[in-house]
Amino acid sequence: MISKTEITRDWLPRYTGTQIEEFGKYILLTNFSNYVSKFAERFGCKIKGKGCPLQTSTNDSGLSIINFGMGSANAATIMDLLTACNPKGVLFLGKCGGLKQSAEIGRYILPIAAIRGEGTSNDYLPPEVPALPSFKLHKFVSDTLLE
């Protein structure tokens, strides 16, 4: 029987057009294609997977960005597939609801928790348990934003 590892090592390159060894050790996930374009432009790197369901770009410092599309099912799929390259950290860049009137366009928002109402994650934790970020990753991003 084929293992989950074999499946992820086959599917990650197929869905992204990017070989496993081309992914960086740190991953940014987004559901906006223009974020991938801006990343590639900023770091002078190529966009891969333009004809695939998921597009990626990796800079020389070992940071990759992946446009995984929309929805919790796609988010769960890309997280499963990323086990093939075993990243040290994954951070989602996206939308944030429930913001105060004082928030301005262009400000960075670093959420401390998320309400899990999509249903998919109920397989992992009860619905009343919020989704919490990795403390180390959250602290790193917070410190970086404060610099």
Task: Indicate residue ranges for each PLM-predicted region.
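Short catalytic/ligand-gating loop segments at beta-alpha or beta-beta junctions
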Residues: 147
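Metabolite-binding pocket within alpha/beta catalytic cores that recognizes anionic/polar moieties
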Residues: 1-140, 144
